[in-house]
């Protein structure tokens, strides 16, 4: 793939010169940059991009929308937007939720200001690749002082019957003192068995006083090798409450970061992960405290089945000058097989004295006494294990503030466990 092909893609979509130029600069950097470091995860031989920038044809794998409620929603299959719904009262308040290139026409100044502002195009090889080759995406913009009570849904299907890379950029801009709940799904759809790649970046910009509840359920298929980056950038007194279910079937490296720029900003990152078969999932979860009295909490629990591998890296970094900051983390992994592999690595980097910080990490097998108790009550081994897993992950799931997300995450866990 050449720079000329990327330039032609930009021209075909009438992208502004600043974006076209950024793609070109990113392309030039790809070869010289290193892969991001995910501690104790070896993924340098994974195929995380084949250097193409193409679009999907209209797909047969389109779900039925006839029973949907009237709330803010966007659905894409591959690179195509197949459903878009914005209630009139929200449109009148200036709310925008549309595909990336349509948003470039509707709110160009905002996208130029915030696109790739929480992650830089030259941070590493995968960031540069993403900037050069992302082929679709979505933008959600909530103006200042707007509160949306119903959950907002963004559903993004990877079409397994298509060979088009799943390279998406999702940009969420929550204006000052706005308040939203957003649910995102990344899911494979179709019967195709061809190998596929995904490079997904989600940016959440929470401006001063904004309150964002962000939930995601990732269910990419076993033939998809993926890099998923979710980044939050928080202003003064802003908050992001993350709840992420990592339930993919293929190999995944993920980077979930919150930069607490503003004084009094607050981020909670709750992650539930389930690895099975022979898959490898490596997850970096990071909070960086820049602002005074900022608070960052990480709570992540994972379960490993069969011969799978799961790595949690929890990273809390308090920057010099962030007086009164607090960084806490807990990472725990439960293994249901003696052939499973796991790491849970707590990392604290503290450059300021007047702060609080703490961490906890554990890896273990199912408690035989728990299994004995459940099986003595007439449960078979598989059912008993499912109950133990639900209890182990439930301590994280119960902290998720949106009931619909809790219920869907539990159903997803049950579905994955039932495939054993």
Please tell me what each predicted stretch does.
Residues 1-128, 299, 305:
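N-terminal amphipathic, basic helical "cap/leader" segment at the start of enzyme domains
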Residues 96-379, 393, 397-420:
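Conserved beta-strand/loop scaffold segments within soluble protein domains that form the structured core
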Residues 390:
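Short, conserved phosphate-binding/catalytic loop or strand-edge motifs used
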């Amino acid at each position: 793939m050449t720079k000329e092909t990327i330039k032609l893609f930009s021209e075909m979509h009438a992208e502004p010169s600043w974006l076209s130029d950024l793609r070109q600069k990113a392309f030039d950097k790809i070869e010289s940059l290193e892969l991001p470091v995910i501690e104790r995860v070896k993924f340098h031989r994974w195929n995380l991009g084949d250097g193409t920038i193409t679009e999907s044809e209209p797909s047969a794998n389109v779900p039925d929308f006839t029973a949907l409620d009237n709330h803010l929603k966007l659905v894409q299959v591959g690179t195509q937007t197949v459903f878009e719904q914005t209630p009139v009262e929200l449109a009148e308040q200036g709310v925008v939720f549309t595909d990336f290139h349509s948003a470039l026409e509707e709110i160009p100044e905002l996208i130029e200001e915030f696109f790739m502002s929480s992650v830089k195009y030259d941070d590493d090889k995968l960031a540069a690749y993403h900037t050069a080759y992302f082929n679709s995406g979505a933008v959600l913009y909530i103006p200042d002082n707007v509160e949306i009570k119903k959950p907002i849904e963004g559903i993004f299907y990877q079409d397994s019957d298509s060979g088009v890379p799943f390279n998406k950029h999702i940009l969420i801009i929550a204006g000052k003192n706005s308040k939203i709940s957003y649910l995102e799904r990344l899911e494979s759809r179709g019967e195709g068995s061809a190998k596929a790649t995904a490079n997904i970046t989600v940016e959440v910009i929470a401006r001063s006083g904004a309150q964002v509840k962000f939930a995601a359920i990732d269910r990419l298929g076993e033939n998809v090798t993926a890099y998923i980056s979710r980044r939050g950038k928080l202003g003064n007194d802003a908050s992001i409450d993350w709840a992420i279910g990592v339930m993919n079937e293929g190999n995944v490296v993920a980077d979930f970061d919150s930069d607490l720029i503003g004084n009094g900003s607050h981020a909670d990152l709750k992650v539930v992960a389930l690895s099975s078969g022979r898959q490898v999932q490596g997850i970096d979860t990071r909070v960086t405290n820049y602002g005074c009295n900022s608070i960052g909490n990480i709570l992540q629990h994972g379960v490993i089945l069969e011969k799978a591998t799961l790595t949690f890296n929890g990273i809390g970094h308090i920057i010099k000058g962030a007086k009164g900051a607090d960084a806490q983390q807990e990472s725990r992994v439960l293994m249901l097989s003696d052939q499973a592999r796991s790491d849970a690595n707590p990392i604290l980097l503290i450059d300021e004295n007047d702060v609080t910080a703490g961490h906890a990490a554990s890896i273990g097998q199912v408690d035989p006494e728990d299994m004995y108790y459940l099986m003595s009550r007439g449960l078979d081994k598989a059912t008993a294990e499912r109950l133990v897993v639900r209890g182990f992950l439930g301590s994280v799931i119960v902290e998720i503030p949106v009931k619909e997300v809790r219920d869907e995450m539990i159903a997803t866990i049950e579905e994955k466990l039932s495939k054993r």
